[in-house]
Amino acid sequence: MILETDSLPEPTNLRELMDYRVFESPCQPFLFSEVDGREYAYGGFSNAVHAAGQLLVSHGVRKGDVVSLLMPNSAEYIIAYFACWILGALAGPVNSLLKEHEIAFVVNNSEAKAMLVHSEFEHRIHAIRSHLPNLKSIIRFDDEKDATRRFRTIEESDGYPIQPRAEPPPLIPIGSDDDAIIIYTSGTTGKPKGCLLTHGNVVANARQISNWLSFTEEDRLLTIMPLFHMNAVSVTTMSALYAGGSTVISPKFSTSQFWRLISDYQVTSFGSVATMLSILLNTYPDGVPEGLQTGQLRFAMCGSAPVPAEIIKRFEETFNCPVVEGYGLSESTCRSTFNPPDERRRPGSCGLPIGNEMKVVDDNDHDVPDGELGEIVLRGENILKGYFKSPEATETAFRNGWFHTGDVGYRDKDGFFYIVDRKSDMIIRGGENIYPREIDEVLYQHPAVAAAATIGVPDDLYGEEVAAFIVLKDGSKVSEEELISYCTERVADYKCPKSIRIVAEIPKGATGKILKRELARIYATE
């Protein structure tokens, strides 16, 4: 579906995409807030965005500036994204699970000029305020029932209206190649890297997902993945907007409320990771609770890490809901492949390219035959412009005109792709990316640790769990529990090892490279 009428051309940036929907269907519902029951039609949403944009302008935000967003899932999170975009500013979502020093790194590295922060997290910003020299303005978002007083500066007592009609901010020229989002993902050095995604990237991925899954204005998606990840932004928000549909914003995944939400809001699809499917199966082994209406549910969309075939089979049989697997990464805005939402689905496969190009190459960047393993490479409208302030990382990732994902997989004779391993050793725990070296460096800071190595190990609930191996310094004594507690104080909880084993030595190859497969074998056999 290409969004063209006699009056408006195909949108090339996110402001045009929003304006298109307001022009076409101003009274059509767009956002439903589960936490307080509020609704935004497209017209009301646009008004709220313009008012929030005016607030940012009043605090000196201009085109090209970065605005950090530290908020829980809410309708206001989407409003904040668009308030940045209509000004030509970059939205900088911050993972709320990070520790304070991790937040400071992301905010400082992105050179953010302003921040929108929920009152729930305000104390965390106060704790590191002196370490955020570039941040000129902090604007707080409160959960007040009066929608006219939700955004305010921390220093002020008066709120700023976001619901009533407001004069639009100055109309800034925005091109499809202008930056829209800087989102941080772990890099090969263990330090997070800022992915620069353009307006064209985000619009393209919304179009690709919406068209592939045949979304229409009748579709109502459920956003339960965190909005600081591109999964929630692209898969269940922007694709809904592109199709003229709607999305229900839930603060977080709740096992007890999940099927009620599907029924009450008549949700037709939702985004998920394998962990969520497993939890739902364990909680509702007999299927959807009686009295709830889920017949309108078309399918579940699942990504981040491969889903075990047995989980897919059980989920589809138990809940009569197909699971459509896909593959992508922050660097591809979100999705690069999806299984077809029909009988062609292949459990275990991540599907077919949905609008970008994708192939498998060897270490010399030569194409490999179907069925042979190699590195997955991508190119297309949804691929990032580059890494912020990281020209070397950008040059390494883009070779011969293709983005190198670091993921190992293969393509079958029918064009379906399969992800087998991650070349980069990245751990994906419940949809969260974890780079082992970061954990290693924390462990090395402990006075009793001589050597450390972290790996991902299979886990029925989270897909992967974090396990570490350490060698003690001569004469040192420390328990595994003490080491885990040490890590808990220094990294986000989801990154913390759940198992730390003390070993005599870390297995290494002839070149000194740690043999992580040997560590995995040791973990599995002990």
Which residues does each PLM region occupy?
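Gly/Ser/Thr-rich phosphate-binding loop
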Residues: 267-272, 281-345, 357-359
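AMP-binding/adenylate-forming catalytic core of the ANL superfamily
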Residues: 98, 104, 115-117, 270, ...
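Conserved AMP-binding A3 loop
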Residues: 39-44, 173, 180-204
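Conserved AMP-binding/adenylate-forming core of the ANL superfamily
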Residues: 27-74, 78-82, 99-104, 155-158, ...
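N-lobe entry segment of adenylate-forming
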Residues: 1-40, 44-59, 63, 87, ...
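Conserved AMP-binding/adenylation subdomain of ANL enzymes
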Residues: 203-220, 228-269, 282-288
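Structural core segment of the AMP-binding/adenylate-forming
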Residues: 58-59, 86-158, 474-476
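Conserved pre-ATP/AMP-binding loop-to-beta segment of ANL
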Residues: 26-29, 139-140, 164-184, 191, ...
